[in-house]
Amino acid sequence: MRINHPLTGSIVALITPMFDDGSIDFGVLKSLVAFHIDSGTKAIVSMGTTGESATLNQDEHIEVIRATIEFANSRIPIIASTGANSTSEAIELTKAAKVIGADACLLVTPYYNRPTQEGLYQHYKLIAETVDIDQILYNVPSRTAVDLCVETVLRLSNIDNIIGIKDATGDLNVAKALIEQCADDFLFYSGDDATAVEFILMGGHGGISVTANITPKQVASAYQFALENDRELAESTNAPLADLHQHLFIESNPIPIKWAMFKMGKCNNGIRLPLMILSQQAQAMLEQDLSNLGII
């Protein structure tokens, strides 16, 4: 079956808030979920790249997803990030996400071991066949060192519970090819804040956004205008965020977004090694962006 809940528009790639010692701050997590519900965010991705999935162990990974689902209390869909570079581990994470009530799962391509296209196809196929939950592919070759080719996505799109893809290549030609060639009920999400509005105007269904952690109302409005094919309003709403979109990636995500949210008073300044607190030079740039937007 195709998806039966409304995963379109602005989907936040939520941070995992931490105390200064790196332990998880579940109190702040609860407040962030409420913040997004109140701000018009359409869904939350829990434990993705922005959520520091790489530095949390598997028990913590599941506990953060479980808490996010509990705090949401069915008021907003929760997409659990359950990808891994081991197919068996991805299956176990996806099974756990289904049991605790996730609405869908986001599965990054296996990283580091660099599978072939056939290996990628078999990886996703087995997960989909093993766990009956809606699944979204996630292609981010800049991080994984492997690119999920359009032809492989087309093959995977024929599997019933693979419902869409997050394309974080930032290449609108790739987006165009995907949108033109896949079935109408296959969902396309931008994973690149800088090009997300244009991606949606081309026929995408939404964006999984880092910037939405800071400006959820503006991102939600820009994406909604784009979904309505109102280019002028979509672009004018998004334009003030252009510098922020860029500077949130001046160092590796989620370093800049976590510092920006700390500066806003939304969370503590905790982050886990090997990631470190944002450098002073980058802090000055982001602080100027936040000031220009009237956030601080």
UniProtKB/Swiss-Prot annotation:
Subunit details: Homotetramer; dimer of dimers.
Function comment: Catalyzes the condensation of (S)-aspartate-beta-semialdehyde [(S)-ASA] and pyruvate to 4-hydroxy-tetrahydrodipicolinate (HTPA).
EC number(s) reported in the record: 4.3.3.7
Main location: cytoplasm
Full protein name: 4-hydroxy-tetrahydrodipicolinate synthase
Family statement: Belongs to the DapA family.
Active site residues per record: 138, 166
UniProt-listed SMART domains: DHDPS
UniProt binding sites for pyruvate: 50, 208
Organism: Ruthia magnifica subsp. Calyptogena magnifica
Catalytic activities: L-aspartate 4-semialdehyde + pyruvate = (2S,4S)-4-hydroxy-2,3,4,5-tetrahydrodipicolinate + H2O + H(+)
PROSITE patterns: DHDPS_1, DHDPS_2
Compartment(s) of residence: Cytoplasm
